[in-house]
Amino acid sequence: MNLGDATTRPPVGRRMKAQAPPPPRPPQPAPRRIFRNAVPDGGGSSGGDCKENMLRSYVDLHISLPTGYQTTINVDGRKALMDLLVDLCSQYHLNPAYHTLELLSPDAQPVSFKPNALLGALDVSCALIKERVLEDRVIRKPPPKVPEKTVRLVVNYHRSQKAVVRVNPLAPLQTLVPVICQKCEFDPAHVLLFKDNINHQQLDLDKSLSDLGIRELYVLDQTLVLQPKMASTPALNYSAESLRSNSLSGSEKKGLLGFLKFNRRKSKGMSVVASGPCVEARPSTLGQSQSVMNISKMSPKVELKKRRAPAPPPAPTQTLPPTSQISLGSPSSHNLLKKRKAPAPPPTPPPSTPEPDISTYVPTATVQEHYIPASVERTPRASTPADDSDLSHSIEDSEPARSICSSSSGDDAAAVGSSSSSLAEEPVTHRADVIAPFTTSTPEPEPKPEYEPELKKEASPRSTPELEPGPRPEVPAAEDLEVEMELKMEETENNRHSGIAWLHSAHESVLERRVQQEVETVSVASSESFADHGYAASEDMAEESGPVSPSERMQSVSPMDIMSLNSDSTLPVKQSKESSSDSDEGCATWGSRQSSGHIQDGQKSIKRQNGYEEDPEITAQIHLTLADLDANLADLNHSDGASVFVDDEIPVSIVDMDIPVTAIDEVLDDDQCSASECESVLLRSTQSISSKPCTPCGVIQNKNNNACLTEEKHRSPFPDIEKQLQTATLTVIDKPTIQSPTSKKPSQDAKITDNMEQKTTFNSEAKSKSETVELTSQKDTVLQKSQSFVRPDVQSVQKERTSSTRVLPTQGKITLSSFSRFGMKTFTVIPPKPAVSQTKPAGSLVTGAIKIDEQGNMVTQRQISSGPEKNNTPSVDTTRADKTPLVKAKAFWSTTEKQEKLTTAKTEPIVNNGDTDVFKASAVTGSFKLSPPEETHKEVIIVERKPISGVASKPSFSENHAEKRDLSFLIPSRRTSSQYVASVIAKNNKNSSIPKTKIDTTPAPLSISGVQNPVNQLLNNEVKPTSIHKPAVTVKPTENPVPSFRPKCLQSYVAEKPTSSERISTLHGGDKTKSLDSQPLSIKIQPFPHVSAHIKSFSEEATSINNFPDTSSARQTPTDTTHPPLAKKPELHKSEIPSEPNQGNVFGPVKKFKPVIFKPVQQETSIHSSLMEAIQSGEGIERLRKVSDLPTSCTVKKPSYNDPENERSALLSAIRASSTSAKLKKTKSVASKELEQLRKVEEDRNVHTEVISPRPTSPDFVPPLPPSFSPPPPPPPPLAPAKPPVVLPPGGNPEAAREALLEAIRSGSGAQQLRKVPVTQTRRQVNGRLGTIQATSPLSYGH
């Protein structure tokens, strides 16, 4: 209640609602059910009772079976008829599924019934059981109706509308017309059926679709087409094709673009006629004065695409009357209908220019603005090219009718077109003259080749209404050529052509003028169809800058080509970065070009360039012009104007042009016949020259989207271009494509081979390639005439830039200058695999040096075995120290092959095969002495990384060792990683560690100087190869390797250096025992306990696997001095303590890097050394031997120090016991703990004695334990506390106590005694398994 109140308290009313009783469920349902049951009966009694009253209780039924048997039975009247059938069938063994029941009334009439009707309710007297007829079902199925075959017929009508009708393909088309017309809402009387809307092939109405084999047709309603067709323009009458069926052809239905294309083709064919009326002189663009409807075959739908009219001219211009007169005088008036009449552009005051004739107004303000600065900055010629593009295009845009005479007839168009082309193509002075017709100024005639008079005549019509028909015949011929060239326009519209045009702008105008006039004539014809060719929708493009007439566009293109040629070489400076050089962009980009003020008409002129090549005369003149340009270019390179050229100002297309032209490994030939290619070469040379002075950063900016060239850094003024070329080229070369023996600056080599493992080797390659590049550049210089010295540089730079894997930081830059985007072609240049010629480094390479070609393949260098190279290796050592293990491995595999060939008799003692076990020590010594320096370098470099000796080694001996040294790569990579750290530590500690470890007799010279004596170097070197090269031999800990590592071998270092070298060689040979026997160890060495312990630990490592070349020489010495006679042990025991500090110094640094070098073995080594030290401290080695020998016996006997075999066996047994004792260690008992306590007490006592007693005795025993296996507890395996045996002190009492304890442990009776032993001294807790020694308080083990 409380909860309910809490929840319902806020809304009190809700609580009342919750308590309201639910609505009663039973009231209505119960009566309804009862009512339903009562209603059918019509009374209070149930229906069953009513029926029962009506039924007869029993019925006498006469039954007739299918077999004819008849009988009479009395049946309960309440049985359903279906049940009756089932009972009868079962009674007479019939299948009710195949039999039916028929009922007959007393009158013998059939009685219809339901299967569930009760027999008593029916008046039945007879029941017939008949077999079911199975065929009745088949009869009942209606016969399948074959559907009428119909197909979907696609009906095209109203140009682009479609309808689908399903019709009978077998019915004749005549019968299908009503259906089609109903669907398309046509009048069947005016309908024509065509196969398609292109060919207008009328179909035979008597044939069916199947006969014709079509499922689609075109329906033409003549009533809809005729009226707009006739009303469009009378000019439509000339096309009989379209009126043949009074229907629009397929080309008509494709809209304005399709129409333009169609007319362009047609106009080309018709323009060839000289004086005949041209159907369409220039179909591509429409006069502004004309509506689209005035064009033939133009449907009203196209009216939406009208060009918006340009602004009305602010003042009347004189150019307009000539155009009107021309149009009046034109023989063909229908041509005018097809051309737009552009309103006269607003007259503008003539720009002030140095030219006398450039009083002509510029049609558009933008053009005028650009035009004025151009003229002011340069000579009339120089100023014109940008202006030319502006003028020509502004004229195109604003006054197509006047300037280009687009509104004139074919003749007028030809004449005026030629004049316009001459206008564009002529130098600025001449173009001003030509432009003058647009203005009041009169053109100044200038002497020109054969075409000039005609051009002047054509130019004059603009200024004067008169037009001479003479030029017309020639114009059609030019047009004919143009038509042919037009077909190839799209192919030749590449960015490089625009660059070529730009190049022409830097050349003299005289030769160009002659070419211009010829080209001008050609361009007149091309003007009619050019713009339309690539740009059918010229209107849309023209909207940006105003109306553009195709002829003007053409004129602006080809004239620019010539104008740029005529213009001074300094003209290119005018070209702005923003101006796009792509002629492919067409009219769409003119707005941006004009905005830059430097429209590059020459770039567009390239569209025509290939067309010019079609004409042999024009081509010949172009080649002559190019020859002169080559001569001029040489001057241009040295001219002051060259400084004006900037990469940014060079047309982007020029660089783009370089992409297809320049091959990575090939030098372009000057033999190229095409003007475009020659021009591209010129452009390239010009570009490289111009960019040199202007790029302070020394970077040539490639507009190819390629990395910038960095050669510019090294470039000097033009006279030195070739030299600069060589240096710059060398600098950029990253990958040697061709290797030729040459020398190169080491600094450049270093740049080139920064990331290469062996810089000297790669430098030689870079040298060779650089020289090759220089040679090729010189070859280019010879070929390229004056321009060649510039061009080879660029090419070589491009080659290297393309092939170089590493790009200098400046190469990542990309110029900000605009570059062509329309039609730009991307070329993926795959450099061929350079033929790598192995060059001998001439002493720069040390044996085993790795040479890597640009393909990443390792090239082996043949070592020169001529004589010992000295003082050359230290630098090489530094380089090698940087080598990665992978590089060293590669060097190994590469050099071993070479070295095998070059191995001399000196290498035989060093041969790694076991066959060379026996050899002369003297010979070995001699070989070591001859080649110790390099060997030490190699071994030290690879292994220790320490500059042990600065002397170069003989290549022959080094080759022998190279094989051994290379074996270091067989070592696991994980250890090689630590070798570098070890090498650093070794370098820091080399002064102390190397000499002290090796020989007591000559420690200072060997260690301090860091340069070992040749013999010692050989020993170290040999040791490393030994450990590296024959790991398998030294791996066996149980065999010779263990004794071989004993510190006694140190004696061998002292007296017999050659013998020690022999030992090393024998180690390589693989028979250490023989070397032991053969070597007389007569020299005494004062071993130091620390040294011996250290040697012991390292010997363990070495025995496990001599995979650690990085270990300092201290470790190597035990490896080298493998088998000293055991008789010298006493001497070792007698070793003076004062020498210990020295050894301690040696041992300390070694320990420092020891863990770093051998991580996996290091732990074992530390464990082993700690255990050994513990054993040594208590002189427990002897006892350990005893225990190992007597696992079952508890007595431990002290073996004599002079018995090496006992020592060896003790160590081996300890090792074995360690593995077996591990199991026992897991289980501990109270007695074992007590035993440990006792041992630790004794151990503590021994620790105190250790400080006082000399350790030299123990070191002797320490080496035998070197195996890297888990620390060997000497006690027998049954001893669970294997640790204690390791700790057992040498004292006799401890031994007896130990034996007693062991017996007690075995019997289990000594536990109490052990507990009773008090711990009075600090003791060490030695864990033999973990190799840890801990000083524990006496209370830790209290019982």
Curated annotation (Swiss-Prot):
Residues 390-400, 445-460, 746-757, 1128-1137 have a biased composition (Basic and acidic residues). It holds the Pfam family Cobl. A motif (KKRRAP 1) lies at residues 305-310. One of its GO terms (biological process) is cilium assembly. GO terms for cellular component: cytoskeleton; cytosol; plasma membrane; ruffle. Residues 406-422 have a biased composition (Low complexity). Residues 324-335, 552-573, 773-789, 1105-1122 have a biased composition (Polar residues). Keywords: Actin-binding, Cell membrane, Cell projection, Cytoplasm, Cytoskeleton, Membrane, Repeat. It comes from the Eukaryota. Residues 1-51, 301-479, 522-613, 733-808, 1056-1077, 1105-1148, 1246-1297 are annotated as: Disordered. Plays an important role in the reorganization of the actin cytoskeleton. Binds to and sequesters actin monomers (G actin). Nucleates actin polymerization by assembling three actin monomers in cross-filament orientation and thereby promotes growth of actin filaments at the barbed end. Can also mediate actin depolymerization at barbed ends and severing of actin filaments. Promotes formation of cell ruffles. Regulates neuron morphogenesis and increases branching of axons and dendrites. Interacts with pacsin1. This is Protein cordon-bleu. It comes from Danio rerio.
